[in-house]
Structure formats: structure tokens, C-alpha cells
Amino acid sequence: MPQDNKRNNTGRPAAGKIVYNTIAKSTRQLALEAMVSIMENGEYCDKVLHSILEKYPLEQRDRAFLMRLVEGTVERCIELDYVIDRYSKLPVAKQKPMVREILRLAVYQIMYMDQVPDSAACNEAVKLACTNHLIPLKGFVNGVLRNVVRFYEDTPYPKAKDEVRHLSVWYSMPEWIVNRFIDQYGFEKTEAI
């Protein structure tokens, strides 16, 4: 901790010392706020992350975790939505925006971040639901994520017969881009790209 942030024995900042004016937030809470800004409000990922990292003085490990989590979730969003839809009774498109982003972040951790135990991804997602005034939906979040943990490795992806859907989900690319590539290069070359 920097010298100028020391507190005296009363718990108050020592006289004349600088204190950061930010409320402590978990890295996952910051990731959730970033995802809402990016996916729900249409803001640019790099600008959102830059703003968060400027505002909150995170340790290097937490900065790296935040950036990997947000950038990876944005990058794999189509695949994540497909997996969530397989294990949720409520389609991703009909979920509350905050719930949708909590699930996306957690499923990304389960599928792509080996250093995060599945149980931690689930528990932290439930905590995020509670922290963000979604207590009635914490059971829904927990249930979907437990199903993902149990079954995601056996998730049937769209068959290659449906070329566009197959490539879209497998590579997490919008269908319009896949269509354009297939029209221009054919299926095999598009898949190789």
C-alpha cells in the first residue's frame, strides 16, 4: 500500500494524506460493468477498459484478469450465448441485461479460464446477482451455471450441414460475416481462415 494512504489508529486517513476517491469493487464487478457498457450500451471495448483501469488502481494480476475476462467474453459471445441457450429455459435474448452479462462472464470462465475453478465462477456469479439487486434471480443464475458445468463439454454444436450456423457458433463470428466469406471463398477455405 502506498505510504500516502496510511490510516491512523482511528480508521480515518492520516492528516494531510491522499486517499483514493473510488469505492472498492471486485474485479468481476468491474468486468460486469464493462460488459454492460459494451454489449448493452454499444460502447467500444478498449475505451471502456481504459476508463475502468484509469479510475480503479488495480494490481497487475487483477488488471490482467479483468482484461482477459472482458475481451474474451466479448470475443466468444456468440458461442457463449449458444451454450447458455442450451442450458437455460429462458433464451439469452429474453434475459435481463445484467443477468445475461453475468452468465456470459461466468460461462467464459468455466469454458476458457482453467485457472478459475468452476465452483468459483458459479459462486462469484451468484454474488454478482445479489450485489446488483437480482437476488430473486440468483437461483436461476446458479441453476444455469451448474448445468453448464455438468454438460458443456458434451454440448452438441450445430452440424456442418448448416454451414453458416456451424461456423458462426464454432468460431463465434456473426452469421453475416460467415455468409460473406462462404460466398467469396467457399466453405472449406472459410473454415480454414
Model regions and ranges:
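Class I Rossmann-like S-adenosyl-L-methionine
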Residues: 1-193
